Amino acid sequence: MTKRITTLLIALMCCGAGFAQKTEVRRLEGEIGIGLVNGVNSLTLDNCATGPKLYGELRYNFRMLPIDVGMQVSGSYFWREAESQPERLKSRSYNVMAVADYNLFRGRRVSLFAGVGVGLGVLSMSHPIDIKNPDAHWAGYSTGEGKNKPCFSPRVGVELFNHLRLTVHYMAEEKANNHFGFSIGGVIGGGRKR
């Protein structure tokens, strides 16, 4: 399996190298954005509710390859609900990740990319979530002990006009914090040289 993935990555880089030589891009770019996330699993509770995501990212674009690498810092919140509780339980996740994107197509107005992030998540709760003596303010719940966990986040998206980036991602962290997300980011720098 590892050999197949390595072979595929090398083939993609070789194919993209010829295209990248024709498309000159600015080396550094930054991105600041907002988004929405929703938990994958409600666990022992009744429902997951959507919450906000804020993030910042700094990337370096390689000269001869359609690849960029960088660092992302983000914070995500979503809620879990239980019918027995009048308030929602907030799930917080703060992440620092090394990211890499492969630019599938880099046009003048539209660019498509697919990428991945790998790093560390600082979590407010972890699995299992147990409600022992429920009261109105979640005083009777407990969670697991894991607070710092590795995270993995595949993503795909489109960059419009070299300044607006729309991304869909999945964050795989710890069972109580896995989530899907959609984000809109403003890009400074980067893009094709004129």
Model-assigned labels for residue ranges:
Residues 20-63, 181-194:
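Short glycine/proline- and aromatic-enriched beta-strand/turn motifs that initiate or cap beta-hairpins
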Residues 72-81, 142-194:
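Predominantly the C-terminal beta-signal and adjacent terminal strand-loop region
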Residues 26-28, 48-54, 90-96, 110, ...:
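Residues that define the transmembrane beta-barrel architecture of outer-membrane proteins
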Residues 1-26:
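Bacterial Sec-dependent N-terminal signal peptides
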Residues 52-131, 164, 184-194:
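Gram-negative (and chloroplast) outer-membrane scaffold detector with strong preference
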Residues 36, 40, 102-104, 170-172:
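Short, well-ordered turn and helix-capping elements at secondary-structure junctions
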Residues 41-47, 83-89, 141-145, 171-173:
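Outer-membrane beta-barrel domain signature
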Residues 128-142:
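Solvent-exposed loop segments that connect transmembrane elements
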